[in-house]
Amino acid sequence: MQKTKKTMAGLLAATVLLGATSVLQAIQIEPVSAASDPVKIMAMGDSITHGYINGDNGYRKYFCYDLQQNGITNFDMVGPNNNWSDSATYDWNGTTITYDPAHAGYSGYAIQKIGSRQGLQETIFDTTYVNGDVSGNMMEAYQPDVIMLQIGTNDVLDAQLTGIGDRLEELVDK
């Protein structure tokens, strides 16, 4: 049973990531003028967004690098978590890449609080949230222009499939 749950979670995550890649490839993004305000992007989700597995900030560094390689440099990754740094680096093919590590990823989180899992929806919209001089719900505090959402893996791992679509729709509609 445990192996089946892990396999299903892996397939779901792969499907979501492949779907996101296809969508990104279909969207034509024009480079933003340096004179305009940076586009605020919030990577939001569970441990996959947090970068927990390798402890290396996960997919976010590759996302930032791909934007830069496509001429999109006027963006700001926003969120309450930054893995203890305002900038981060990684080495790729002998090149040191610098990227913005800010995000709203939380290891172990489900779409909504369910069982012993904390819920992303409750955390994001918690009006008692305080981080330094930023307070209020995260959407108001950071005002992202773009949200990248990767959530639901822990719902699948815990076999909390009943209502998963409704929970996700409720989060997205907020």
Question: What are these model-derived regions, one by one?
Answer:
Residues 18-36:
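Sec-dependent signal peptide cleavage junction
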Residues 1-3:
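N-terminal secretory signal peptides that target proteins for export/translocation
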Residues 37-39, 52:
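Nucleotide donor/acceptor-binding cores
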Residues 6-21:
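Sec-dependent N-terminal signal peptides
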